[in-house]
From Swiss-Prot:
This is BTB/POZ domain and ankyrin repeat-containing protein NBCL. Disruption phenotype: Normal stem and root length. The Ljnbcl mutant exhibits many developmental defects including strong modification of flower development (i.e. abnormal floral zygomorphy with symmetric lateral and ventral petals and altered floral organs number) leading to almost complete sterility. Altered abscission of senescing leaves, of corolla and reproductive organs in aborted flowers, and of petals in developing fruits, even after complete pod senescence and dehiscence. May act as a substrate-specific adapter of an E3 ubiquitin-protein ligase complex (CUL3-RBX1-BTB) which mediates the ubiquitination and subsequent proteasomal degradation of target proteins. Transcriptional co-regulator involved in the promotion of leaf and floral meristem fate and determinacy. Required for the abscission of senescent organs, probably by regulating the cell wall disorganization in abscission zones (AZs, e.g. pulvini at the base of leaves). InterPro entries: Ankyrin_rpt, Ankyrin_rpt-contain_sf, BTB/POZ_dom, NPR5/6, NPR_central_dom, SKP1/BTB/POZ_sf.
Length: 483
């Protein structure tokens, strides 16, 4: 067993203590009228807040309270007493405990489940108002209870969410980031609000006046930076540069909105006219990622055939390409049409993730967890087909690179050309053999087990109840697909 497997097993063992409720529990919390059983030693070891709360020098009173205004109480409740928690909700408290017990947590609601503040049916809750609210509440709880690792994880999640969230939600995160001195998140959100084009009088209805002033300052700096790249031949034009650039930015925003409406109505000809007549840049407008996520295969194909969009253009802070997005959607049609137009299956995001990595992770989760609520959107046959398509494309590219390298070697060493194989021997190139072995293993794994994993949930009586407990609403997995 590898070190990673050992740590994962240890994490699950501790998490099972929390899931099993009263087993070996020596402390009970009351959150929103519901009891949560936990273990003092684990909480004290993982959180300075709980360490002070449970191990204070004063005699324990009949009951404790985690919500004292001066910070963590040093008074500990007597064994058997119920500790009321009023500062956070039940779901957020369980998410925090899950992180304290296992070191892992997914700070998003389960996909497709009904949520407050989200009226969209079948929403994936990756960047909707409900998902943003849950992340903000989790961040506040992590800061309140001094769980800094969870706070950092939540900040990273929010930074990913706001790229696709509504401008109202971005402003909520902006306020929270200033209140809690989260400078990187502040920078991300302030630039998004600045680029939104909302006039100051509208921003002032949602934000304090000093923040509105900072947003306007950002806009001015951005305008000046763009002006510095453009030669000015007339003093009059220079004098009115700020106004002209602001108008140009508004015009670009209008173009993007028109483009999206055209794509929504499958009017690719209008998009073509905008490219040819108005100079619309499809890559900067994120036309292809938008079409992959919101339009039909035919629209995506027609857009690619215009020849004006880079199929491998990285978009958003994560650097995901359209193929990454199609892989997360588990859409064989989209994956196929992108690969047909030379999408690169080996391209990596900023975090080093390839489309093949995404599909492998989904396959692993599906096989391990079965068709739990968080994975119900995945159809085994579609996942298998997506994996096969991307694997095949990766293998073809690997062989083409091998041919190119072999030909280059032959040209440089003509006398040795007869002894140079077209493909390097598998045992001489560890990386190549590892990659091909992984492809073959993935293929066999999907063929043999993917369909069975979905059907065997009811038959596996020895592990069924345990797996069901492991996949309660507060223990779910997330694959974000922002761009």
């Amino acid at each position: 067993m590898s070190l990673e497997d050992s740590l994962r097993s240890l994490s699950l063992d501790y998490l099972n203590l929390l899931i099993n409720g009263q087993a070996f529990s020596d402390v009970t919390f009351s959150v929103e009228g519901r009891l949560v059983h936990a273990h003092r030693c684990i909480l004290a070891a993982r959180s300075l807040f709980f360490r002070k709360f449970f191990c204070g020098p004063d005699p324990p009173p009949p009951s404790g309270n985690l919500d004292s205004p001066g910070g963590p109480r040093v008074n500990s409740p007597r064994p058997g007493g119920v500790i009321p928690v009023n500062s956070v909700g039940y779901e957020v408290f369980l998410l925090m405990l899950q992180f304290l017990y296992s070191g892992q947590v997914s700070i998003v609601p389960q996909k497709h489940e009904p949520r407050p503040n989200c009226g969209e049916r079948a929403c994936w809750h990756t960047h909707c108002t409900s998902a943003v609210d849950l992340a903000l509440d989790t961040l506040a709880a992590a800061r309140y209870f001094g769980v800094e690792q969870l706070a950092l994880l939540t900040q990273k999640q929010l930074a990913s969410m706001v790229e696709k969230a509504s401008i109202e939600d971005v402003m909520k995160v902006l306020l929270a980031s200033r209140k809690q001195d989260m400078h990187q998140l502040w920078t991300t959100c302030s630039h998004l609000v600045a680029k939104s084009g909302l006039p100051p009088e509208v921003l002032a209805k949602h934000l304090p006046i000093d923040i509105v002033a900072k947003i306007e300052e950002l806009r001015l700096k951005s305008t000046l930076a763009r002006r510095s790249l453009i030669p000015h031949h007339h003093h009059h034009h220079h004098h009115h540069g700020h106004h002209d650039m602001g108008a140009a930015a508004d015009l670009e925003d209008q173009k993007i909105r028109r483009m999206r409406r055209a794509l929504d109505s499958s009017d690719v000809e209008l998009v073509k006219l905008m490219v040819m007549g108005e100079g619309l840049n499809l890559d900067e407008a994120l036309a292809l990622p938008y079409a992959v996520e919101n339009c039909s295969r035919e629209v995506v194909k027609a857009l690619l055939e215009l020849g004006a969009a880079d199929v491998n253009y990285p978009s958003g802070p994560s650097g995901k390409t359209p193929l990454h997005i199609a892989a997360e959607m588990v859409s064989p049609d989209m994956v196929a049409v992108l690969l047909d137009h030379h999408a690169d299956p080996n391209v990596r995001t900023v975090d080093g993730v390839t489309p093949l990595d995404i599909l492998r992770t989904l396959t692993s989760d599906f096989l391990f967890k079965g068709a739990v609520p968080g994975l119900t959107h995945i159809e085994p046959n579609k996942l298998r087909l997506c994996l096969e398509l991307v694997q095949s494309a990766a293998l073809v590219m690997s062989r083409e690179e091998g041919n190119a390298n072999a030909n280059s070697s032959n040209n440089n060493n003509a006398p040795c050309s007869a002894a140079t194989p077209i493909y390097p021997p598998m045992n001489e190139d560890h990386n190549s053999s590892s990659s091909n072995a992984n492809l073959n293993l993935d293929s066999r794994l999907v063929y043999l087990n993917l369909g069975a994993a979905q059907m065997s949930g009811d038959d596996d009586s020895s592990h069924g109840s345990h797996r069901e407990a492991m996949n309660q609403a507060m223990y779910h997995h997330h694959h974000s697909h922002d761009y």
